[in-house]
Amino acid sequence: MGSSEVSIIPGLQKEEKVAVERRRLHVLKALKKLHIEADEAPVVAVLGSGGGLRAHIACLGVLSEMKEQGLLDAVTYLAGVSGSTWAISSLYTNDGDMEALEADLRHRFSRQEWDLAKSLQKTIQAARSENYSLTDFWAYMVISKQTRELPESHLSNMKKPVEEGTLPYPIFAAIDNDLQPSWQEAKAQETWFEFTPHHAGFPALGAYVSITHFGSKFKKGRLVRTHPERDLSFLRGLWGSALGNAEVNRNYIFDQLRNLLTLRGDVWRRTVANAKYIGRRIFAPLLRLQQSLQRERPVLEDEGGEPNYNWLTEMLENWTRTSLEKQEQPDEDPESKGSVSDFLDFVRKTSICASKWEWGTTHNFLYKHGGIRDKTMSSRRHLHLVDAGLAINTPFPLVLPPTREVHLILSFDFSAGDPFETIRATTDYCRRHKIPFPHVEEAKLDLWSKAPASCYILKGETGPVVMHFPLFNTDACGDDIEAWSDTYDTFKLADTYTLDVVRPLLALAKMNVRENKKKILREMRNAAMLYYPKHYAQSCSLV
């Protein structure tokens, strides 16, 4: 159990310092195996961008090949956004066993089954929380279907290999959605939020809470009410809550809600106790719910929501078209985990959250904290945390602070569209906050984006060297980049991902690492020789 107090400490947290120091010993051994002599271990960070299932699968391929080539053992930090967080977290739940991880991936995508009943149980349970939001629904009903897994472990379970230094230190990115206006206007550093096996918090403020108490209620820096640590399924939903734009996400959610009332009898029996004649028992309450939401429409609009009740009308119409036999499935499982009232409460809460478009609601651990001068941060009772890809689709802002002393960044970009948009956005962010980052002329980025190669090496006068690896590139894809992009579109549902679709993407991601191994080793060797923060002789260049 972590500390029950809020920590306001500039720089690295104590647990991270200890873990990183232990990791240095393993990195030095790994460098020696790679024939790189170093008195001090350079800090290498690997970044994985967002990109839904495409990023999930490609990031697994990158990690697997880096392990195979002996490169992963020389890495200090692993950081991810959105779909890459699903891959990175899987590395730790499998204790770093890449063979087991790939076997699990093949198993998951060799079958079409998805345990809807279990996912629905988890969602109904989550709806009992006062802070239930669309993130809960998204995590258990959408992301679990996309990835075909529902992990129940926790971030704190990852501590052992991290503290022993046997695996890199993981950082999972999110942003504070309430600060989006500040981000749009000034790229406010406070927007970024991070999760590690030890803590969750705002690195720009040095404000953290133990990961075991993330979601618990705090006031004036003291624990007021303890809530259970959120499981990895929920966090994956939070980190990956922007697979598409608002319209795409809305359609995902409404489609799932529409389908709930046409569930098979066995699903009802596994999720709702005393499910006999459930149709007759829930139709009237759902009808009242629809009428209630219509009455509340002006209130919800005042709160900035965009009410849309068509899905609920369709739910009711679907139900009336369902045969009586299906509506009145008998209850054969008295051990079911929910009740009809639980189900109705879940639908009611989801309806309200959908109307208000409320995501990522959690208690603000900085509420009324006297050590925070910014009242915007301490006056709110709740935070609303969402996918960091809505700001920058890769976690550069979390590894660039000088306290982490990163010397070399391997940026694997699995984004849709322009693979240099993350470089542009990070350049703008760093310019505004005077953070060292290689500058690249816009004309050069435009040229590169038309026919991207597999690796770009960016160097500035100070700060880390950045190696940027576009997933779809001319070296691997030739003239077929557009075809590859269409095949692995971010918005494609998991149903379209068969093993025949997964294997080529996994192989492509591995090849990008393998074909650039010499360049990676060269930059690792340079980092070991030119220990940060010594100046690099070259200006930004392509190697």
Regions found by a protein language model. Give the residues of each.
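Catalytic nucleophile loop
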Residues: 49-51, 74-91, 172
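Helix-rich "cap/lid" substructures immediately adjacent to catalytic or cofactor-binding pockets
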Residues: 24-78, 109
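Acidic, Ser/Thr-rich peripheral helices and adjacent loops at domain boundaries
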Residues: 95-111, 342-345, 420-463, 471
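N-terminal charged/capping segments associated with class I S-adenosyl-L-methionine
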Residues: 1-44, 48, 93, 100
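A short acidic (Asp/Glu
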Residues: 57-59, 87-92, 183, 394-397, ...
